[in-house]
């Protein structure tokens, strides 16, 4: 039986829709629409089965009611620095400059991560001793302490069909005393102390379509990027910090990608600069330097622009 042209078109559309449904969607939530800005950290990963993971809400999410969030099943936090856990944040997008956005809203002493988890009734997944900290914060603010879940080094948890494993990140993780408050916090600040909540972490996510993603968090160069992230997990897509000073810079980050992790593609993160203007990479930036140094396709996380990746970490839409 020969198909009519309309039947053939319908069949093609069905195949295309099925292929798209098997992809992982990644949506950056930055401070300025269509740009990659200095405080941009947050990404939303959406599994083909609908599970949505907010990675490091930081300062670029406009509170728990930010309409860009939608449903959030998991809040994933790499460490407790304010630009990742969220000590302050924007009130709305496109306020201030890309290099210095307005962040007038405080989330202390809870953190934006906790505020989002409470509002969305989502889990918070962390490694090291951060799990106990978030459990206490959730309980103190009317939530369920059990919603703070631990994936310690070498182990993993699965939430909504997505496997989350903790990997090494070489970075500090001091807890700002303002998360504690009161005379204890005052004494800590007066003496230059930060609280201990364990080591900073990176993560490896395995989605239901088979895609394995490495999330660097804030890190330097580590042997585990080769032996664990590539050797064991075989990550096909990476999200890599490039900001320098606090983390690997463009050259170091490119070495991690080219020689250690060796994914098929990479998304830039944590540039600490206005990396784009009008959606185009600015000349002379760390963003440009990294993209020139890596040997694989690299993608700038333009705020609000959804990218789709197949099981091999290849961008098939939005890049």
Language model: regions and residue ranges:
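Active-site neighborhood of phospho(di)ester-bond hydrolases with catalytic His/Asp-centered motifs
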Residues: 54-58, 72-88, 124-128, 214-219, ...
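Active-site environment of divalent metal-dependent phosphoester hydrolases
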Residues: 34-39, 61-62, 81-86, 126, ...
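Active-site-proximal loop/helix segments of hydrolase catalytic cores
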Residues: 58-66, 186-259
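Binuclear metal-ion centers of metallo-dependent hydrolases, dominated by the metallo-beta-lactamase
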Residues: 116-125, 132-160, 255-319
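Pre-active-site segment of Zn-dependent metallo-hydrolases
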Residues: 31-114, 173-193, 219-233
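Bacterial N-terminal signal peptides
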Residues: 8-16
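Sec/Tat signal peptide C-region and signal peptidase I cleavage site
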Residues: 17-23
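Bacterial N-terminal signal peptides that target proteins for export
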Residues: 1-8
């Amino acid at each position: 039986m020969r198909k009519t042209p309309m039947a053939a078109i319908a069949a093609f559309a069905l195949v295309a829709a099925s292929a798209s449904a098997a992809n992982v969607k990644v949506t950056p939530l930055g401070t300025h629409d269509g740009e990659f800005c200095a405080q941009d950290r947050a990404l939303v990963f959406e599994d083909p089965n609908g599970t949505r993971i907010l990675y490091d809400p930081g300062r670029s999410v406009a509170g728990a009611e930010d309409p860009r969030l939608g449903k959030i099943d998991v809040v994933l936090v790499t460490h407790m620095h304010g630009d990742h856990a969220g000590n302050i944040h924007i009130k709305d997008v496109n306020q201030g400059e890309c290099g210095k956005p307005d962040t007038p809203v405080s989330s202390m002493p809870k953190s934006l991560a906790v505020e989002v988890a409470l509002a969305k009734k989502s889990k918070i997944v962390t490694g090291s001793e951060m799990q106990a900290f978030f459990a206490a914060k959730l309980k103190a603010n009317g939530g369920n302490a059990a919603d703070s879940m631990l994936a310690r080094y070498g182990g993993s948890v699965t939430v909504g069909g997505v496997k989350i494993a903790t990997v090494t990140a070489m970075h500090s993780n001091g807890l700002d005393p303002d998360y504690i408050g009161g005379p204890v916090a005052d004494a800590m600040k007066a003496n230059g102390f930060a609280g201990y909540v364990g080591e900073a972490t990176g993560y490896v996510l395995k989605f239901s379509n088979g895609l394995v993603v490495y999330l660097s968090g804030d890190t330097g160069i580590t042997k585990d990027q080769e032996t664990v992230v590539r050797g064991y997990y075989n990550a096909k897509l990476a999200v890599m910090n490039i900001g320098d000073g606090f983390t690997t810079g463009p050259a170091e980050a490119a070495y991690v990608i080219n020689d250690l992790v060796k994914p098929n593609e990479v998304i830039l993160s944590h540039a600490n600069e206005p990396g784009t203007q009008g959606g185009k990479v600015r000349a002379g930036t760390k963003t440009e330097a990294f993209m020139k140094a890596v040997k694989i396709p690299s993608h700038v996380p333009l705020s609000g622009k959804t990218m789709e990746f197949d099981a091999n970490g290849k961008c098939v839409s939005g890049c």
